UniProtKB/Swiss-Prot annotation:
Keyword Zinc tagged: no
Keyword entries, A-Z: Cytoplasm, Protein biosynthesis
Chief location category: cytoplasm
Subcellular location(s) of the protein: Cytoplasm
HAMAP family: RRF (MF_00040)
UniProt-recorded Gene Ontology molecular function terms: ribosomal large subunit binding
Name this polypeptide is given: Ribosome-recycling factor
Amino acid sequence: MIDEIELDAQERMEKSLVALKGQFSKIRTGRAHPSLLDGIMVPYYGVDTPLKQVANVVAEDSRTLALTVFDKSAIQAVEKAIMQSDLGLNPMSAGGSIRIPLPPLTEERRKDLIRVVRNEAEGGRVAIRNIRRDANGDVKDLLKEKEISEDESRAAEENIQSITNEFIKKVDSLLADKEKELMEV
């Protein structure tokens, strides 16, 4: 029973970490990366469609993304969707493809992004601590129902705390990597 609680807590913490990685990948660094455009939806035949289903996105070099649109009639819609996104990008179409040069980040913008990244990381830590609280509550419930002893309860809480510490370290490591990536010029 305790093992199930610990395993559940660990799985939920892992999901929180994956969600945080997803949030971090959406935050633009100085480098071109195809995942930068993941959240963009393109109106395609009257239906909002994810950009990656309408075009192939590749990083041409460290400052340029190249898109190959599958249906040439959708090029204007793709360009418009990219311009309307809050990424501040200006796509240029050339024949059947679209190139997106990424402007270098200003020092002020980098600091703003670092602030955003730190807030996201803190949200990840809070989510992990909430999972710990839930797991410890489940252990306390078992103790109240006399299904486990106090020693087992204490040991389980220590295990849950060590799992929590491990995931908090992973969040801090992700944050440090992202900050370093953002500060590279």
